[in-house]
């Protein structure tokens, strides 16, 4: 079974468990996004670059309030695709501090309406999904409880 077939199987399991997120992990350059794109192509799933979620309407919201409105605004955008399975690429776009988005909460809320699949741009440490700022300080730490983790082998 190749990596795309393996991922398809994991996503199909996630679809059966409504309210699930599939996180694809792997080293930088391991092909996380490539596998997601290929799976999206095979199954005709909706592939969304997270940069497309950052609309002028979102940016017009006062920075401190963006985290409150992001889940509903993003769900509305994703609903316009009329798809059950959503591939979110470039997740790190949502980590920008001025957006004030709690990515963990966002993915959990979106997963109530869609099966969310995304590549994790960071690493796993002590069982948590972690992402560091460019200066090397830890920026995000998320418990993967309730998420399906699938690792790309390089």
What are these regions (language model features)?
Residues 1-17:
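N-terminal pre-Walker A segment at the start of P-loop NTPase domains
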Residues 27:
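P-loop (Walker A) phosphate-binding loop of NTP-binding proteins
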Residues 31:
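Conserved glycine(s) of the Walker
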Residues 81-99:
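Conserved P-loop NTPase "ATPase switch" module shared by AAA+ and STAND
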Residues 24:
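Hydrophobic anchor at the beta1->P-loop junction of P-loop NTPases
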Residues 35, 39:
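Hydrophobic positions on the alpha1 helix immediately C-terminal to the Walker A/P-loop
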Residues 52-78:
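Short glycine-rich substrate-engagement loop in P-loop NTPases that contacts/grips substrate
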């Amino acid at each position: 079974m190749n990596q795309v077939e393996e991922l398809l199987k994991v996503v199909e399991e996630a679809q059966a468990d409504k309210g699930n997120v599939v996180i694809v992990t792997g080293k930088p350059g391991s092909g996380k996004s490539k596998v997601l794109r290929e799976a999206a192509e095979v199954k005709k799933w909706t592939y969304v670059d997270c940069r497309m979620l950052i609309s002028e309407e979102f940016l017009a919201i006062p920075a401190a309030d963006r985290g409150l409105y992001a889940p509903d605004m993003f769900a509305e955008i994703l609903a316009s695709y009329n798809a059950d399975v959503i591939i979110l690429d470039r997740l790190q776009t949502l980590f920008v501090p001025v957006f004030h988005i709690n990515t963990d909460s966002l993915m959990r809320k979106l997963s109530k309406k869609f099966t969310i699949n995304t590549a994790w741009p960071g690493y796993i440490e002590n069982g948590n999904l972690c992402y560091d700022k460019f200066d090397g300080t830890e920026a995000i730490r998320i418990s993967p409880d309730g998420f399906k983790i699938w690792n790309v082998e390089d």
